Amino acid sequence: MGDPFGYEAWQGHFELPCLNLRNPEVRQYLFDSIQFWVDNFNIDGIRLDCANVLDFGFMKELREKTSAMKPDFWLMGEVIHGEYNRWVNPEMLHSVTNYELHKALYSGHNDHNYFEIAHNVRRLEAVEDRFTPLWTTTTRTGSQVN
């Protein structure tokens, strides 16, 4: 059984405890919390921090549950890098952050390196052609970026 006084933390940040998403009671608590916000505040969606480390099974169930709560409910995930289509698909998230493009826009503009911007936009357009219409919902500039 493990230490009853200890817990796992996200990347060693103990103010961010890891939730046991394999536990059905924990999952249901999260779904009930979202239902509360939908019922009382008519929210249209949520943003999942660090979606790239969340269990895909959980995100699939989250998509199913939130779509039942509100058909147009929006799920957006923070994904730093990778094959974004692993997260953006009809079973999981509607969109993800796109820090790769944000970096190209930010540094390319500041350094007057417009080749960097053009290269990254062309690269994303090539990927987008394969995954349209899902990819088009990708956030073009990341959030929480200084």
Please place each PLM-identified region on the residue numbering:
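Active-site-proximal helices and loops of the catalytic beta/alpha 8
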Residues: S33-Q35, D39, D49-F131
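Active-site-proximal substrate-binding groove within the catalytic cores of carbohydrate-active enzymes
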Residues: R122-N146
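Structured loops at beta-to-helix junctions and adjacent beta-edge loops in soluble globular domains
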Residues: R22, E78, E100, W135-T138
